[in-house]
Amino acid sequence: YDEMQTLGDNKAPVPTKNEIFGNRECEDIDLKRCYRTPKEILVTAHALGLGIYRDVRKPIVNMIEDIKVWESIGYEVVDGELKYGSYVKLDRKQIYPNLISDPIRFQKFANSTQQYEYVTNEIKQLIENEEVLADDILIIDLDDKNIKSNSMKFKEIFYTTLEDNTNFFNNGQWLKTINVVDKGNPKLFKLENSIAYTTIYRAKGNEANIVFILNCDAISSLESTSRNCLFTAMTRSKFLVYILDSNGTTNYEEEIKKVKDNNYVLEFNYPTKGELKKIRTNSKSEITVIKSMDTAIKSFRNAVEHNKKLELELLLQQTGKDNIDELLQYLKEMKDKPDEW
């Protein structure tokens, strides 16, 4: 049971052994080796999922509560102590060498069109020059609410770019389609000679050699469940992962660089039990406030784009008075305590 792959707003409690197996006698077997995801991707996914290298005084937004789990999943202490409230440095063994030096590629774009054009050209290069199979590529769109319109826009750019390219084929076969896996097509995830395009909720439990994570700006960098989405998406990859920001608003690039500069080791101060409780509480309140902020920002952008006057009444209609008050209080606290963010 993986706490960091919980994708809903409310985390379910980790079930006990008795809740799963009853009173039957059983033996614990720790699976310390990960044969799917390379060390570089897995450690970076943990760092991003927990917020370990965020550039703030209190970076942690999520944490594995049972400290014994770290050793169970293959990490070992190389410095400090693995206990609540202490400094610790965790490393893990490289099970097999990665064939490329940079398996995590982050890119920012000014808009989604540039993002989709980049993905199209990367896929073209991978299939034509690297002999990658189309069905070894997985596209995960973190903007799950807009997957229908996003996938249509991507397919239009993809097919328009490649329609005149008579050399674009895969082992003698033409690339058949972009296979959108959503509510209308929930089961046919992997089709021969097709690229799957899906949400993180459909991608969970699946894997691919190469994973493109689109629209990572659609999730909050503060919210623990959002970072769980990013962690889960990254760990679908067996070889190479692309993390793409469609409007240049995230700071994941700096966090990824810190992991690499630290030789893919996790180095942080483990939260105290009291801090762990506060992290859980803050996570729930942030979800409500951040959703209100997202709604307000979208309303503002829409008004500006259409040259309309943005009035307070519009915000009240979109978010509700209670959420406006909470949003203002939240922003005031951030202004008063900048060193905590």
Language-model region placement:
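Conserved helicase motor core of SF1/SF2 NTP-dependent helicases
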Residues: Y1-E340
